[in-house]
Amino acid sequence: MSGRIDLKSVRLKTAQKYSNWLLFYLFFQKQAPFSVPSFNPEEHARIEGGTRDAYITRMHNGKGYIMVTTDMCVRKSRKWDNYGIDLLKSKDLKNWTSVTFDFRKGMQNFCDAATAQSPYKDWSTINRVWAPQIFWDPDYRWENGEKGGYMIYYSMLNRAEEKYDRMYYSYADKTFTKITTPKLLFDWGYATIDADINYLKSDGLYHMLIKKEGGKPGIYTATSKYLNHGWGEPVENDYVSFEGRKNCEGSSAFQLMDDDTWRVAYIQYSDNPKHYRICKADKYLRNFSDPVDIKGVTGPQHGSFMRITKKEYQNLLKWDKKLKE
């Protein structure tokens, strides 16, 4: 799999207003009808040589970009298991540096290993570290008293010690090169993956979109007053259910400019080919409606959306053109 950037405005079959704002779409697939690799996965994915589930955002101070990916088994072992994540940063969206965390190596990965409690007895039996995402937490306090860190949340499975995928979180420092020992975010008694957290000004709560493995298919929502704890079970009567019994995952919620409502992108992967779709939600991230396909995306995987400036977009177009010469 290669990481690729669609440098064209993403066009939908309907709702043309999307094309004004969805300027940057980072995704991972075997082949793409346009553009060039944004980076070489074999260089940055040091465990398996492949990447998936890319989540990109700006640094907390606006001075650059950070990205986190699943180090995915799509090149070397080609097994379903994977063992770690990759943290990347860039000043220009073109040149990236990275660090890789192979969770099979255990506590040596984590900067607080001397004082933290390990969630596992044996890290060598880890089976999955999936779909990491980032949320800047200005109130997080490090052991040295410094405040502010990037909360990275993801699902993990260690079959030797737990029965199903559960959501965990670590904190990365401001250099985006160190992470803390994973802590359990919640356990609802069944498998959960592909969490997407946003803070909503409309109600002052954190909202999480998440896929439940088992039960009724769909993308569900849960809320909390706090970022890293207090997550109750998801709402059962208001969820992304347009696909019926077909399976969907990989949700990403975002807002358009000058609009307090939300859009939710997700993958419907039961069909062949898969569909990357976007639906609407109200300002409380509820009442999902009007799903449409994203046009021109083949073989979609779990991606993310980030608003960029006109200048950034033009720079990317120039870079894309130069690489194609």
Language model segments and positions:
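Carbohydrate-active catalytic/glycan-binding domains of CAZyme proteins
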Residues: M1-E325
